[in-house]
Amino acid sequence: MILPNSTAVMPFLTTVWQGTVQPSSNASGLARRSPLRDDGKLEALYILMVLGFFGFFTLGIMLSYIRSKKLEHSHDPFNVYIESDTWQEKDKAFFQARVLENCRSCCVIENQLTVEQPNTYLPEL
């Protein structure tokens, strides 16, 4: 098996680099050069493609959300029960019964040793 020579690429890259760089300019001058007029067409196409994919993706999510909301309002017995007011009336009656039951079971037991006595002196800390 013959292993590839990775150093053989370096002279090729060097010649390509020297061909693009002008002899009188430095390496940072390439970054400051203005792009040619034909270079801007592909960037605009790329931006339009990204926006198109984003719009398509967003529209798909929005339509699936709307469709799922429509399915929630079907004639499913659970949804019919939730939409009806009977459970709210039953819940209100149950709550009132619980409050009355708790009020009836409440009582206060008075401890005669802890009842306030105006004649007794309580030292302050």
From Swiss-Prot:
Superkingdom of origin: Eukaryota
Highest classification ranks of the organism: Eukaryota, Metazoa, Chordata, Craniata, Vertebrata
Main location, first listed in the record: membrane
Organism: Cavia porcellus (Guinea pig)
Subunit annotation: Interacts with KCNB1. Interacts with KCNC2. Associates with KCNH2/HERG. Interacts with KCNQ1; targets the complex KCNQ1-KCNE1 to the membrane raft.
Name of this protein: Potassium voltage-gated channel subfamily E member 1
Membrane topology: Single-pass type I membrane protein
Cellular component, GO annotation: apical plasma membrane; cell surface; membrane raft; plasma membrane; voltage-gated potassium channel complex
Compartment(s) where it occurs, according to its Swiss-Prot or TrEMBL record: Cell membrane; Apical cell membrane; Membrane raft
Stated family: Belongs to the potassium channel KCNE family.
Keywords: Cell membrane, Glycoprotein, Ion channel, Ion transport, Membrane, Phosphoprotein, Potassium, Potassium channel, Potassium transport, Transmembrane, Transmembrane helix, Transport, Voltage-gated channel
InterPro entries, A to Z: K_chnl_KCNE (IPR000369), KCNE1 (IPR005424)
Gene: KCNE1
Pfam families hit by this protein: ISK_Channel
Reported modifications of this chain: Phosphorylation inhibits the potassium current.
Residues bearing glycans: N5, N26
Transmembrane segments annotated in the record for this chain: 44-66
GO BP terms: cellular response to cAMP; epithelial cell maturation; membrane repolarization during ventricular cardiac muscle cell action potential; negative regulation of delayed rectifier potassium channel activity; positive regulation of potassium ion transmembrane transport; potassium ion export across plasma membrane; regulation of heart rate by cardiac conduction; regulation of ventricular cardiac muscle cell membrane repolarization
Cytoplasmic side: 67-125
Function statement: Ancillary protein that functions as a regulatory subunit of the voltage-gated potassium (Kv) channel complex composed of pore-forming and potassium-conducting alpha subunits and of regulatory beta subunits. KCNE1 beta subunit modulates the gating kinetics and enhances stability of the channel complex. Alters the gating of the delayed rectifier Kv channel containing KCNB1 alpha subunit. Associates with KCNQ1/KVLQT1 alpha subunit to form the slowly activating delayed rectifier cardiac potassium (IKs) channel responsible for ventricular muscle action potential repolarization.
Gene Ontology MF term list: delayed rectifier potassium channel activity; potassium channel regulator activity; telethonin binding; transmembrane transporter binding
